[in-house]
Amino acid sequence: MYEKSYEKEITVYQYECDVKNRMTAAALLKQVQQISTEHCDIFGLDAAYYQSTNTAFLLSKISLLFHREILVGEKLKLVTQPSLPVKAVYHRYTSAYDEQGKEAASVDSRWILVDTQTRRILRKIPENFHFPFLTEQVPEHPCKLVKSECMEHAGEQSDVYSKVDQNGHLNNTEYASIRVRYWCPFLKLLSIQYDPWCWLIIMSCVLEKQWICLWAPLKMATI
């Protein structure tokens, strides 16, 4: 069995929204994480399978784009599409469509498959690894890295039990909340009212009880 995509319908609830009844970035990422997990579970790619093959998928980069504000009570259709790896990177693109069939938001995530025993990146699909997603290419965001010319200390964040996943790592969706929490004062300072892009460049996993130091860019230069 092979499916290029998987879809489900969701309703945006109040607890997923901010003070202005807008769906938060973290809430949308949680929904994207859930539909991606469900898609993998259909083909047997669950926690037990990864453990038996000593493998794990780690998120290396993720980009979220809101085409417009998504409000409480809206019904969305999520469509997720994974692809074959390109240079050891596995892409998964997920779209959120409104009831008029227009794309309200999209998420481009990039993953790497690692050997949990040797801690090495597996640049090719292992022979004994069942990977059912055969699409060669999916849509993607222009995820260019941004070099900051000047940085200012924005704060520090400690991980806690309620925010870690089954691997003891900070849950990927929590990075969105952290970004908004420490970035909003700088957005107000720069008189930016609405930021449709939420770029989360995840370079390493944060383990439980570890601290991360956050720096906010004052001037950006694309590289």
Where are these regions (language model features)?
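Hot-dog-fold acyl-thioester-processing enzymes
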Residues: M1-L59, S106-D108, D115-Q193
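HotDog/MaoC-like acyl-thioester-processing domains
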Residues: Y2-K8, S63-V146, I201, C205-I212, ...
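Short, well-ordered coil↔helix boundary/capping segments
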Residues: H169-T173, W199, C205-L207
